[in-house]
């Protein structure tokens, strides 16, 4: 029998790849995962408790995940996705609407599809540094959240940028609106020198992907539930629906180890090595864009697209998180004493990259849709293709997703505006890859 996965990984690992991407253990060079033993991959035998009705060691382990006294921690073995789905489902029978940001993770939209409910899309602000969605436009937030049963925010964004989550949560709480914060990329927040976690804002539900920035196994996340959160019993019930009936003890144990790492972490060495890395990146001619989260670096090269930079890095077996037309994104390790991360080798390989001197190319800035909108769940049965320029006031029958960054810009069920048509034409005219548009045509609801 052919073994394509086994063979590929064996081949890949022989090249000694260096990780500047998730997961946070960075090819098992960060943290304490050497304490894991595959013999721990067991089932719920006597003494090992049950994640779906924890009364023993699993309950005690989760009680030890203390980041804020007002929250209880719940292990997620099906990723942050399972936590998001559970919270959305937990509010499905309540009156009112869901309200959310446009840069929500796809699991939010999947949750709305499963509940067959629509959502208000908030007006958005755009980052001047990265040209990505930053957060909601806070100038008239209170006017947009009327009759909201659950508000959903992404903090930080994928590129490591933060908005005023404290003010945002305060506005929602004063209006009596429950809040879910997708803090997938902020499990390390709260460490010295890093942004504050939204756990300090009183949000009702905060979900963190420990595996993205802390040293735990992929798919291991934690849902933090406030002691006064509405619908908490419902949400806890749905955690059993959206997670495997055979939860992995390896994943749960890795969460315990990662949290122990977090509680003991001293960030001084991290910032020393980060400074040295930034110096080398600048020395070889790259531009370093620093953002709110020190763990993320956005890198640009004069005359290079992000995709070209990615190829140059990969030629030296350095693997980054993502590339777009203008930059690449690095996710740094949480360096610590006794880590085995190949830092000196990374610097050597970076110095080996041969950058040609190029004239600066015109940046291809994707324009974002920032206006208020509505996301409609459910399937659209009758559809037809139509030229973009004839689509104003029609109903989109599919999502419009430019790649990268792979964020849904326009949503199935939205009414097409003149601004949307302008954006779609801009993307097509600049040869950007956009899922949902082909040869200046899109799918609309046939009415």
Give the positions of each predicted feature.
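N-terminal "arm"/small-domain region of PLP-dependent enzymes with the aminotransferase-like
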Residues: 1-56, 177
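Conserved N-terminal alpha-helix of the aminotransferase class I/II PLP-enzyme fold
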Residues: 38-81, 103
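Conserved beta-loop-alpha segment that forms the PLP phosphate-binding cup at the N-terminus of a helix
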Residues: 72-95, 111
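PLP-dependent aminotransferase-like
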Residues: 96-147, 151-153
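Active-site phosphate-binding strand-loop segment of PLP-dependent enzymes
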Residues: 130-188
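Active-site PLP attachment segment
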Residues: 199-236, 243-254
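Conserved PLP-dependent catalytic core of the aminotransferase class-I/II
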Residues: 259-288, 311
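Conserved C-terminal alpha-helix-loop-beta "cap" of PLP-dependent enzymes
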Residues: 282-404, 411-412, 418-432
């Amino acid at each position: 029998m052919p073994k394509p996965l086994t063979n590929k990984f064996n081949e890949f690992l022989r090249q000694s790849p260096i990780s500047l991407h998730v997961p946070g253990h960075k090819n098992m060079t960060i943290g304490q995962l050497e304490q894991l033993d595959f013999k721990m991959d067991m089932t719920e035998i006597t003494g090992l408790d049950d994640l779906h009705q924890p009364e023993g060691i699993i309950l005690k382990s989760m009680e030890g995940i203390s980041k804020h006294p007002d929250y209880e921690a719940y292990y997620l073995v099906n990723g942050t996705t399972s936590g998001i789905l559970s919270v959305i489902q937990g509010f499905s029978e309540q009156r009112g609407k869901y309200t959310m940001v446009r840069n929500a993770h796809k699991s939010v939209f999947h949750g709305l599809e499963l509940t067959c409910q629509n959502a208000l899309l908030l007006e958005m602000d755009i980052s001047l540094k990265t040209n990505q969605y930053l957060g909601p436009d806070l100038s008239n937030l209170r006017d947009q959240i009327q009759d909201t049963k659950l508000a959903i925010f992404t903090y930080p964004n994928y590129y490591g940028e933060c908005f005023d989550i404290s003010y945002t949560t305060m506005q929602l709480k004063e209006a009596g609106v429950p809040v879910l914060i997708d803090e997938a990329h902020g499990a390390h927040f709260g460490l010295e020198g890093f942004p504050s976690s939204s756990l300090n804002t009183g949000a009702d539900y905060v979900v963190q992907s420990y595996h993205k920035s802390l040293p735990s196994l992929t798919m291991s996340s934690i849902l933090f539930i406030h002691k006064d959160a509405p619908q908490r019993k419902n949400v806890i019930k749905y955690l059993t629906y959206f997670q495997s009936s055979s939860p992995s003890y390896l994943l749960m144990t890795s969460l315990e180890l990662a949290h122990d790492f977090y509680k003991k972490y001293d960030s001084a060495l991290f910032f020393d090595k980060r400074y040295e890395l930034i110096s080398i990146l600048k020395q070889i001619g790259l531009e370093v864009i620093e953002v709110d989260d020190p763990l993320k670096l956005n890198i640009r090269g004069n005359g290079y697209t992000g995709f070209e930079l990615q190829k140059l890095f990969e030629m030296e077996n350095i693997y980054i998180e993502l590339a777009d037309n203008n930059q690449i994104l690095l996710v740094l390790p949480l360096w610590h004493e006794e880590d085995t991360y190949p830092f000196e080798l990374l610097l050597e390989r970076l110095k080996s990259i041969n950058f040609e001197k190029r004239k600066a190319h015109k940046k291809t800035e994707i324009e974002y849709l920032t206006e208020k909108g509505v996301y409609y769940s459910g399937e659209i049965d009758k559809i037809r293709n139509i030229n973009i320029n004839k689509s104003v006031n029609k109903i989109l029958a599919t999502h419009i997703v430019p790649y990268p960054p792979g964020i849904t810009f326009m949503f199935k069920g939205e009414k097409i505006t003149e601004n949307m048509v302008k954006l779609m034409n801009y993307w097509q005219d600049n040869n950007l890859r956009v899922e949902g548009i082909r040869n200046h045509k899109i799918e609309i609801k046939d009415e």
